[in-house]
Amino acid sequence: MTSGERQKPVLVILGPTASGKSALAMNIAGNLDAEIISADSRQIYRELTIGSAKPSEDDLRMVRHHFINEKTIGEPFTAGDFAEAAYARILDIHNRNKYAVVVGGSTLYLEGLLKGFGDLPPGDQEIRSRLTAELALAGGEKLFERLRKLDPIQAATLDPTKTRRLIRSLEIIEITGKTVTSLQEYRRIPALDYRIVGLSIARPILYGRIDTRVDEMIASGLVEEAEYLYKKHYSLLRTERNSALKTVGYQELFDFFEKKTDFDRAVTLIKQHTRNYAKRQLTFFKNRLNVTWMDAFGEHAAPDILRAACCRELAE
């Protein structure tokens, strides 16, 4: 794309879960007459509604959203797929003389779109099998501690209980002799003019919002939604490569259905695991992306962000 074609900046609003990204994006999209690109790896699935905190039907009618309800559980859609498709849609939005606002918190979706994925090596089955056997024998904590020593930045972005990315990170180190973090430093320069704003929110306030959101999800029917998924997609739950059903909020309820925990404990774990996820998101954003952090709340939040990051004339 030539510089002459890059007429419009692309505003990117990111932040931890429950930080108010979607509401702010709706406000800004209204000011810009923009379309929203959802960078959320769960909202793209039709079946994951309450637990993924999708925009309301009213919001979807008022502002055009991309990558909401476009896939069904079981359809593969990687971060690379998202980056390629989102890039093409942003170009289309610009060609229609409109703005695009990217909003979300899925770290790999955002990094793929904003920076492009580098040339990571293909998998090595022998190495992967050995690491998987070591995981089964020694447990994930030992492997996670190894990664923390070799690549602390990558380790800080991972959930120690989710082992697929842990094994892949160690596999890449063995294949290349380099860490994932160092390999990612050589990615292509983005072809679009991204203006990245992160929503800053005090940790106690964020955690309070997370607890409130979980309670509201339960009251809105999360248990029933999870039970439907559990019954209809039971076989997929046993598939290691299907990560959509391993989402926080659903996985804990699946354990409740299987009598591995009681209901109150499941809800407590949803809140705890969501807080852990928010912490990993913040670590990722601060280590991997060039973000301008701004106050998430207040009546002037939307115009302040427009003025500072994107479209000063539209903030007046």
Curated annotation (Swiss-Prot):
It catalyses: adenosine(37) in tRNA + dimethylallyl diphosphate = N(6)-dimethylallyladenosine(37) in tRNA + diphosphate. HAMAP family: IPP_trans (MF_00185). Pfam families: IPPT. Catalyzes the transfer of a dimethylallyl group onto the adenine at position 37 in tRNAs that read codons beginning with uridine, leading to the formation of N6-(dimethylallyl)adenosine (i(6)A). It comes from the Bacteria. ATP binds at residues 15-22. Keywords: ATP-binding, Magnesium, Nucleotide-binding, Transferase, tRNA processing. Its cofactor is Mg(2+). This is tRNA dimethylallyltransferase. Transmembrane segments: none annotated. It is an enzyme of class 2 (transferase). GO terms for molecular function: ATP binding; tRNA dimethylallyltransferase activity. Belongs to the IPP transferase family. GO terms for biological process: tRNA modification. The keyword Nucleotide-binding applies. Monomer. The record marks 106, 128 as: Interaction with substrate tRNA.
